[in-house]
């Protein structure tokens, strides 16, 4: 689903993707391949991957649906239930885990502001980072933009993406937010409304 190098050269990955009935079973893992193994492979050397690949197994019903973001603090991964800051420490070290709310991959009705008609069961927004913040959207009614403290995972701000929608319009977010940090305490964001661009049929019981 997604791969990204962290600042230490470890390669983080998330497997899984979009699925019907996510509560039925655990699907996919998140983890990393140690830089030492990658360097060895690139140098044409033999390496024991059983000692270089580390995974964090998600619980049944939880899965990654978005891209990974890397910072000097670690790798930020958003699942349909939690946002994680993970660090490579001879294994996957969970620095923090922040749960968030989601209405799920439901079919939107008239006037509904959730992500019905989108792809993700959780927030469809890959995390966007500033030096101090992690930003992503949830999948509530209405859909909110959340800002988490990079060091602690605490939610420091939350605001509806659009809090005054015309009748019959919905919000669905399936892309990363555009973020600008002016370095003086002001962070500006642009969030794209993806609603109407496609429906994977994840809420269809058939």
Labelled PLM ranges:
Residues 1-14, 18-206:
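Extracytoplasmic/lumenal domain signature
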């Amino acid at each position: 689903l997604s791969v990204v190098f962290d600042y230490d050269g470890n390669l983080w990955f998330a497997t899984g993707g979009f699925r019907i009935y996510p509560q039925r079973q655990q699907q996919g893992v998140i983890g990393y391949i140690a830089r030492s193994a990658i360097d060895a492979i690139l140098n044409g050397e033999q390496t024991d991957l059983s000692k270089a690949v580390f995974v964090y197994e998600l619980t049944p019903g939880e899965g990654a649906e978005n891209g990974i973001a890397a910072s000097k603090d670690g790798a930020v991964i958003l699942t349909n239930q939690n946002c994680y800051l993970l660090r490579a420490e001879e294994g996957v070290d969970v620095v923090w885990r922040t749960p968030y709310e989601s209405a799920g991959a439901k079919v939107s009705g008239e006037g509904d502001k959730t992500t019905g008609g989108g792809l993700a069961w959780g927030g469809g927004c890959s995390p966007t980072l500033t030096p101090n913040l992690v930003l992503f959207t949830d999948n509530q009614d209405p859909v909110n933009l959340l800002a988490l403290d990079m060091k602690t995972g605490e939610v420091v701000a939350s605001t509806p993406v659009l809090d005054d929608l015309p009748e019959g319009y919905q919000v669905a977010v399936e892309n990363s937010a555009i973020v600008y940090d002016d370095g003086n305490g002001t962070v500006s964001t642009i969030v794209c409304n993806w609603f109407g661009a496609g429906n994977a049929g994840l809420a269809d019981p058939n």
